[in-house]
């Protein structure tokens, strides 16, 4: 069996408790006609403040109004809302009764992309460690609103908006993706990764469910709850990878407890690209079997399907996937190295 994924009890030094430069009171949730409005309340004496470097993104609670829930899970809940009159998405990270440290790390990891702006990355607008007193919340993060359709929905046809017209085409509940769409999505994802890696950020949970699709069909990478920031000037983190992420997309070196590098995201991209082309789940076996086989026997999803051989584009994508999920980290291409070939492929479609 592969080595268990190490769990480290640490938080980055710059995220240690510090006085915020702006007032941030614990809000009160008041039901409204069209939603719920956050209003300032009495600050909790135990509330942690954002560190000075993040004080710019403190939340103006009286300008935030929740409209409707978009989804929920073990991390907490996401709402559609308005902030200063602009439509946004609000994530409320809940405290985990089983693992509070993991909840805290996830919240602070989300802020790794604070102040970064890129067309293929979901932008953080504001954040606060304050939360409604009635909720078991660790903090609140306001992000740009991209929509509620992910690449997972597009691939597997699990969102009604992407299933219209399929019955007329004789489909089986999902609309086929063209090679052109596969290349365009891949180009967007790698462009976003190249930007993140240039900023010293490794996502560590790249998969279709964490890639949002805009109304114009562009991809934006989101959900940075597992991300890590590499030390300036270094190509790898001095920390081994923490628990978290999705085992089907997790690079073998991380499963073995080795150091984090940006190449871990490239491995995850390869699995994601395979899903875009094949529209199947990468592995169907038991979790522990898959973990063992990926590390010990270089198990990967199959590339024998006709779609990878019938056209020049399919053959090129097969070559890219093969290169990106190599077991040896050094043999994988970087996002910056991948971009030229993907862009050339896109231009020649």
Swiss-Prot record:
EC numbers: 2.7.11.1
Residues that hold ATP according to the record: 70-78, 91
UniProt-recorded name of the protein: Serine/threonine-protein kinase mos
Function: Serine/threonine kinase involved in the regulation of MAPK signaling.
Alphabetical list of CDD domains matching this protein: STKc_Mos
SMART domains: S_TKc
GO molecular function, one term: MAP kinase kinase kinase activity
Alphabetical list of InterPro entries matching this protein: Kinase-like_dom_sf (IPR011009), Prot_kinase_dom (IPR000719), Protein_kinase_ATP_BS (IPR017441), Ser/Thr_kinase_AS (IPR008271), Ser/Thr_Kinases-Pseudokinases (IPR051681)
Main location: cytoplasm
Subcellular location: Cytoplasm
GO biological process, one term: protein autophosphorylation
Matching Pfam families: Pkinase
Residue ranges of the TM segments: none
Stretches assigned to the Protein kinase domain: 64-345
Keyword terms, alphabetized: ATP-binding, Cytoplasm, Kinase, Nucleotide-binding, Serine/threonine-protein kinase, Transferase
Domain of life: Eukaryota
Reactions mediated catalytically: L-seryl-[protein] + ATP = O-phospho-L-seryl-[protein] + ADP + H(+); L-threonyl-[protein] + ATP = O-phospho-L-threonyl-[protein] + ADP + H(+)
Originating organism: Gallus gallus (Chicken)
Record bears the keyword Cytoplasm: yes
UniProt-listed Gene3D superfamilies: Phosphorylase Kinase, domain 1, Transferase(Phosphotransferase) domain 1
GO CC annotations, alphabetized: cytoplasm
